[in-house]
Amino acid sequence: MSLKEKTQSLFANAFGYPATRTIQAPGRVNLIGEHTDYNDGFVLPCAIDYQTVISCAPRDDRKVRVMAADYENQLDEFSLDAPIVAHENYQWANYVRGVVKHLQLRNNSFGGVDMVISGNVPQGAGLSSSASLEVAVGTVLQQLYHLPLDGAQIALNGQEAENQFVGCNCGIMDQLISALGKKDHALLIDCRSLGTKAVSMPKGVAVVIINSNFKRTLVGSEYNTRREQCETGARFFQQPALRDVTIEEFNAVAHELDPIVAKRVRHILTENARTVEAASALEQGDLKRMGELMAESHASMRDDFEITVPQIDTLVEIVKAVIGDKGGVRMTGGGFGGCIVALIPEELVPAVQQAVAEQYEAKTGIKETFYVCKPSQGAGQC
């Protein structure tokens, strides 16, 4: 049964009438451009064919009812006329409440809604299950009530909800790609202007995501430390963000910086340049150059930004040994575990899967999870 069929059937059972529409918003994987988003830089993600799906209908009162199919059909209910506060027990409900609360601040011309939510974006893998939920909820209200909001505004609203209501610091990339993704394309995003450029993906190339299943423990504290180090670097150059510093300016005075901060800054500056070049390489179908840029990105995350772990490095090496210069592979996401992403000619996918199955667990004691994805369309009706 598809997610659409599942949520529609649950909706009718739970609420006693049929849903009027079903909305989806995808998860994402970032092909290159890591930790550049909060430095006002560039990222190159694509939406993937794993999504959050919501069957919904407007109500003629001010009540919101939400059922979470993936959490034992837990039900949350709140009013649009009372202050929206955090749910005491259901963490999932806070993403919904946060989006609705922040949408009220932007455009309060919507009424109540019934929703049933289900999704298949793997959680805790760094594939943005939370952003896809935020964008899906925003899109539901936008579509049901014809709100004059575009994808970028729905994305910004989701980011605000996550930062201010849920209390998790995140950049804008995850929500933007979920809202604006384009089938068979990646999206080059300028995280300062929020300008986007669709970049066509070469034909016959699979987007493979492999979860190391190494449990991330440091990710919150270390993420904040990296952010502070980048801000320290920007202050040193008297710029609002590292986006405004050139590699030449950095090289001239790198020796004056704290050595750790210097390494962090160098990663951001070189990663921004790589990301812009990667968009051109992809568009020209130059998988060899894309592979080189992904390899440089991984080395920079490992040596300068220091956010990889041995298990991730092992996975990258196993994949690289199979694909050579026919594709690319690197860690993706915040770091300290999580996933790697690879662009692989479709005919090499079975060989990569076999090599990983034979070697990764033997070397690390952990079993990986393997996903073959397609670059997919952003949020909308399904």
From Swiss-Prot:
It is found in: Cytoplasm. Keywords: ATP-binding, Carbohydrate metabolism, Cytoplasm, Galactose metabolism, Kinase, Magnesium, Metal-binding, Nucleotide-binding, Transferase. GO terms for cellular component: cytosol. GO terms for biological process: galactose metabolic process. It holds the Pfam family GHMP_kinases_C. The active site is at residue 174. SUPFAM superfamilies: GHMP Kinase, C-terminal domain (SSF55060), Ribosomal protein S5 domain 2-like (SSF54211). Its EC number is 2.7.1.6. Substrate binds at residues 34-37, 223. Belongs to the GHMP kinase family. GalK subfamily. This is Galactokinase.
